[in-house]
Amino acid sequence: MAALDAIREALPEPARDIKLNLQAVLQPGTLTPAQRWGVAVATAAAARNERLLAAALADARAEVEPAVIEDALAAAAVMAMNNVYYRFRHMVGKASYAEKPARLRMNRLVKPAASKVDFELFALAVSAVNGCETCVRSHEQVVVAGGLSEDQVHEAVRIAAVLHAAAVSLELAGYAAVPSAAAAAG
């Protein structure tokens, strides 16, 4: 976890909790290494921070097969589209939109490179980051029906939350060095 350790060290003091959580959530728990690192890569991609994604990819490549990483990146890409589309349908609340076919290609959901259940878990984590209630509910049902426990789902969402917070915290690092208005005036 050397690359993500470097990210942890780059986080500013206001993100101290995130620094500690980033180390904790990626330790072995209820998820397999493929699930843990797939969620980390997918949510780092969804957070759109190049530094964080590069670090997650570097550490994941040392732990899992390339197919897992490919699926994680595909989940981030497909969910970037689906989360917007299905969140709109949910938010507008009109039956007429719900009846319209999506007509959006999402073949990777059906044919992932590695595990179908793991791909759905990656999609669930990204959907949580992107705030799509419909997608979160749908993917949660699929992974639980596929044999994952609520503890595993919970662990995946904890990873997603911390990776997202790490991306935000990396952005804060540039502002932490900026003097406050009071300090500049004094």
UniProtKB/Swiss-Prot annotation:
Which molecular-function annotation in GO is an example for this chain?
Answer: alkyl hydroperoxide reductase activity
Active site, renumbered = 132 (proton donor), 135 (cysteine sulfenic acid (-soh) intermediate)
SUPFAM superfamilies under this entry? AhpD-like (SSF69118)
Name the Gene3D superfamilies for this protein.
AhpD-like
Tell me which UniProt keywords the record has, alphabetically. Antioxidant, Disulfide bond, Oxidoreductase, Peroxidase, Redox-active center
Q: Which domain of life is it from?
A: Bacteria
Q: What class of enzyme is it?
A: oxidoreductase
Does the keyword field hold Transcription regulation? no
Provide the E.C. number(s) assigned to this enzyme: 1.11.1.28
Which residues pair up as cystines?
A: 132-135
Q: Pfam families of this UniProt entry?
A: CMD (PF02627)
Q: Which InterPro entries match?
A: AhpD, AhpD-like, AhpD_core, CMD-like
Its UniProt entry gives the catalysed reaction(s) as: N(6)-[(R)-dihydrolipoyl]-L-lysyl-[lipoyl-carrier protein] + a hydroperoxide = N(6)-[(R)-lipoyl]-L-lysyl-[lipoyl-carrier protein] + an alcohol + H2O
The answer to whether UniProt assigns keyword Disulfide bond to this entry is: yes
Biological-process GO terms, alphabetical: cell redox homeostasis; response to oxidative stress
Function in brief: Antioxidant protein with alkyl hydroperoxidase activity. Required for the reduction of the AhpC active site cysteine residues and for the regeneration of the AhpC enzyme activity.
The record's section on PANTHER family has: ALKYL HYDROPEROXIDE REDUCTASE AHPD (PTHR33930:SF7)
Q: What family does this chain come from, according to its entry?
A: Belongs to the AhpD family.
Protein name as catalogued: Alkyl hydroperoxide reductase AhpD
